[in-house]
């Protein structure tokens, strides 16, 4: 099984020892080579950093370092939005109203035959994508 990691999951894992135990257990049981990120996740992390920067430059700098580590660690396993993802997004967005980034993540997972790992399962329910919420179960 290969996995597309949503922003809420990679952010949870960043917490280290404060990470939710079920998420930590799931993360420990998967191989790095089976984990993928969307470029949109990197964008969401960047947006968060820029939101923090005006009020806490030190925290923003720490998050910058973490983001650089994530980009380095995932390297070629960062997936962009190409024509196939865009067309799939168009099809699934016609099914019902879905936040754009969530629908693009679902489309990316569908195109690349990945399981979307997210806490926000309701956002992609009924779109045909396989989903895992590791907050609920470390084994499924």
Feature-to-residue mapping (PLM):
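Short, flexible helix/strand-to-coil boundary loops that buttress conserved ligand/catalytic motifs
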Residues: 14, 49, 93, 128, ...
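A generic structural signal for short hydrophobic patches within well-formed alpha-helices
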Residues: 10, 42-45, 86, 124
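Short, well-structured N-terminal submotif of metal-dependent ribonuclease cores
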Residues: 1-37, 41, 51-69, 138-140
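Acidic active-site catalytic centers that drive phospho-/nucleotidyl reactions
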Residues: 6, 44, 102, 120-123
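Acidic, PIN/NYN-like endoribonuclease modules and their adjacent C-terminal/linker elements
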Residues: 1-2, 106, 110-140
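General small-molecule cofactor/ligand-binding pocket signal
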Residues: 36, 79, 132
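Active-site neighborhoods of divalent-metal-dependent phosphate/nucleic-acid chemistry enzymes
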Residues: 47-55, 61, 65, 72-119
């Amino acid at each position: 099984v290969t996995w597309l990691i949503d922003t809420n999951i990679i952010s949870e894992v960043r917490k280290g020892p404060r990470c939710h135990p079920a998420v930590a257990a799931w993360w420990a049981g998967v191989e790095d080579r089976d984990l993928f990120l969307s470029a949109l996740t990197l964008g969401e992390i960047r947006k968060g950093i820029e939101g923090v920067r005006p009020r806490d430059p030190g925290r923003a700098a720490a998050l910058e370092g973490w983001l650089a580590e994530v980009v380095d660690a995932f390297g070629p396993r960062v997936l962009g939005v190409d024509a196939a993802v865009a067309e799939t997004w168009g099809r699934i967005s016609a099914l019902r109203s879905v936040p754009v980034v969530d629908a693009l993540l679902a489309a990316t997972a569908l195109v690349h035959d990945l399981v979307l790992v997210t806490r926000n399962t309701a956002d992609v329910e009924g779109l045909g994508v396989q989903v895992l919420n590791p907050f609920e179960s470390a084994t499924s």
